[in-house]
Amino acid sequence: MRVAFGKLRARLATGIGSTVAVCAATVYGILGAAPPPAATEYTAGSQIEAGQWQVIPRRAWVSEEKKVLGVRLQEGERALVVEAELNNRTQASTRDYAKLLKLHPVGGVPVPDPEVALVREARPLPLLHPGLAERVAFVWKLPASAVLPTSLDADVIAKTYKPVDNLYGTPGWFNPRVVGRITMAVEVTESVAGWAS
């Protein structure tokens, strides 16, 4: 009788454990499938806290010049530019700003990461130092055949500071996530006015 009771107890424990595991997986699956919260909407002049960066978008414009603030364009390319004030809120100089703004597809075509230029010196932006706000330009290269938007939509991507990384045990900025969306009108010069949608 003692052996049978031990087997019964083992089967019962296994059954309960399995049931709890299945229920937990179901609950986590349901919670994970929930839609993410709506992103905060920002416009030109909005002050945005984005983890290690503070960004204030100023204006968006289009250029067909061969060189836009130090960023060279190839034949058959145009530039979609977002000017913004950018402030490094960390304690170290960094150039981790290229993925701060993610432009939504233009005319259904995905857009690569921008090149970032320093407006006051018209050259590609090097390290950005802590506490020193700079006016910068995010320059996306687009094919000349791309239909230009009259309004620009871009996600603002922030990272979270971790004092100890799980993999290396060092501090850093990790886990990029969308913290908002910038919507602003695109200024089109006369030379490219015929291309706007």
Describe the residue ranges of each PLM region.
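Membrane engagement elements in two modes
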Residues: 1-66, 74-75, 172-197
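Short strand-coil-strand connectors
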Residues: 49-53, 106, 155-159
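Hydrophobic core residues within well-ordered beta-strands of beta-rich domains
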Residues: 53, 80-82, 134
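The feature marks short-to-medium sequence segments in extracytoplasmic or secretory-pathway proteins
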Residues: 61-63, 74, 87-136, 163-169, ...
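Extracellular Ig-like/FN3 beta-sandwich strand-entry sites
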Residues: 79, 133, 147-149
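Short, surface-exposed secondary-structure boundary micro-motifs
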Residues: 85, 138-139, 143
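Short, surface-exposed ligand- or partner-binding patches at beta-edge/loop junctions that are enriched
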Residues: 142-169
